Amino acid sequence: MKPVYFFLGANSEEGFFSLYDQLLGGRLDDLMILKGGPGCGKSTFMRRVGAAMERAGERVVYINCSGDPDSLDGAIFLDRNAAIVDGTSPHVLEPTYAVASERYVDLTRFYDVEAAKARRAEIIALSDEYRAHYRSAYRILRAMGEVESERRVAMHAQMDFSKLRRRTDGILARELRGDGTGSGRVDRAFLGGVTHRGEICRFDTVEALCPRIYAIIDSAGLGNEMLETVVQAAQAKHFDIIACPNPDRPRELHHVLIPEKGLAFITTNARNPYDGKPYRRLRLDAMAEEKLTRAQKAKLRFTRRVEASLLDEAVGALSDAKKAHDALENAYHPCVDFEGVTALAEREINRLLKQ
């Protein structure tokens, strides 16, 4: 299996939203929680361990960083029931069952403390700057959510949900024949979100796990009830599920993956276009909009333009945060013993492979 990619955090209208806690509680046999500040090589450490596990033929799930999707915040080793994850802010993790299930891997030992203190003023200024940019981004995302809410209300009022329920029941009757071999477990992970590179979605992960794809064309949360129904039906049939929340509104679902069936239901729209060839398309936006008046449609076009403008502003703020964070990491780099970090990564690789 090729590695696949998810997110466990999202930049949402609620601020940073974390799903990292689901890794705790003894769920994994070995959860390594990395501790260390900026620039100490946490992402490189995880990438090195993940690459070694791939070479050993292990199945690896990588967790992208919501602040920088080119960086890693975790790696899960399915065949070992083990994982390594960045446990620092904004997704702080503390062991539930220390050492027996979860344990710290401390990278702060590789800092030259005196060298870092010599750059104290620079480090403080850059830390405060990137945090301020994040606060700005979250204010803008909240505003975007308020604007979007008006459009959603108008579209929900026109949606024939009873018709959608009947269609959902028909799809599930065809697709979920027989029972699964799992326990009906639900793992939650984001497929993407708003980042400094704009809005992204890892549809490549969907295609790697589930070749049979139902594309739900929906920009207003019209499909949330349908997706919840899919989850419940799959659980009842003992299929394990990956439920992917909407990164803008994490209390709602955006995608559901049922890998054992090779079946996925994904949400796609102008902000997150799916360029592949789905098995079926469900045009929920069209179902709602066909009943709108000309004046209502004009208002929706206006709100979409406002949303797009606010999204651009949020991405700009996240880009500014990324620049400040890069500068902060560069300030720390001369203070880090990277040979020591690499040696520790190799020890953890050897320990994992001996399990």
Regions found by a protein language model. Give the residues of each.
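Glycine-rich phosphate-binding P-loop
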Residues: 31-50, 197-234
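A cross-family "folded-core" feature that marks the main globular domain of proteins
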Residues: 34-35, 45-46, 53, 61-64, ...
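An accessory alpha-helical subdomain
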Residues: 122-174, 302, 306-348
